[in-house]
Each structure stands twice: as structure tokens, then as C-alpha cells.
Curated annotation (Swiss-Prot):
Induction: By FGF1 and phorbol ester. The gene is TNFRSF12A. The chain crosses the membrane at residues 81-101. TNFR-Cys repeats lie at residues 36-67. This is Tumor necrosis factor receptor superfamily member 12A. It is a single-pass type I membrane protein. The keyword Ion transport does not apply. It comes from Homo sapiens. Residues 28-80 are extracellular. PANTHER family: TUMOR NECROSIS FACTOR RECEPTOR SUPERFAMILY MEMBER 12A. One of its GO terms (cellular component) is plasma membrane.
Length: 129
């Protein structure tokens, strides 16, 4: 009797392997193994790839488990903080520029010295040589 049950088990094993081979040759996809593009996941219920963006509206769909975790919510205060920092930098730059200009303006002499060479007595060619 043990020999008959062993044969039966062997037949079942061969039959199972044969069915698995036929299934793989036929191209039938196992759930979760379909070659979906990035941002989509295989839905066993619908037998096609579904977009992961729809998981926000329906998070309990069967294909949402294959999607990566949802990206974190964007930081909404980024632009106001960045704008404030740039504005502060611009105002401080203008203020420091004005203070430097005012200080240098105070030291500047309003008349420039005039060099008197005596007219035509000293030609430019003589200075170069």
C-alpha cells in the first residue's frame, strides 16, 4: 500500500510541475509580478497595471500595497521663508552699501589738484625718454 501512495504522490508532483510550466509558458502573470512601469502597480482584480496616484483617493485598493510609500507632503512655508530671507539680505546689502558710500563721500575732496607744468615748456615726448 505504501508503494501505491508513493506513486500517487509522485504523479501529483509531476502534474503540479507540469501545470506550473504550462502557466509560465502561457505568459500568465502571477499577482504582483507584472512588469508595470514606474509609478504603477499590478492589480490582480483588474488584471492590469494601475496608476499609484489613485491610491490617495482609494487607499484600500489591492494594487496600493505594491506602490511605494506616498511622498511626504511638500513644505508649504518654504517659499515665504526663502522670500523673507532673500528680502532681508537685499535690504541689509542696500543699507550697508549706503553707509559705505556716505562715509567715503564725506572723506572725498571736492577739488582736484591741478598740476601746473608751465605750459609748452615740457613736451610729452621729453617725459617718455
Amino acid at each position: 500500500m505504501a508503494r501505491g501512495s508513493l506513486r500517487r504522490l509522485l504523479r501529483l508532483l509531476v502534474l503540479g510541475l507540469w501545470l506550473a510550466l504550462l502557466r509560465s509558458v502561457a505568459g500568465e502573470q502571477a499577482p504582483g509580478t507584472a512588469p508595470c512601469s514606474r509609478g504603477s502597480s499590478w492589480s490582480a482584480d483588474l488584471d492590469k497595471c494601475m496608476d499609484c496616484a489613485s491610491c490617495r483617493a482609494r487607499p484600500h485598493s489591492d494594487f496600493c500595497l505594491g506602490c511605494a510609500a506616498a511622498p511626504p507632503a511638500p513644505f508649504r512655508l518654504l517659499w515665504p521663508i526663502l522670500g523673507g530671507a532673500l528680502s532681508l539680505t537685499f535690504v541689509l546689502g542696500l543699507l550697508s552699501g549706503f553707509l559705505v558710500w556716505r562715509r567715503c563721500r564725506r572723506r572725498e575732496k571736492f577739488t582736484t589738484p591741478i598740476e601746473e607744468t608751465g605750459g609748452e615748456g615740457c613736451p610729452a615726448v621729453a617725459l617718455i625718454q
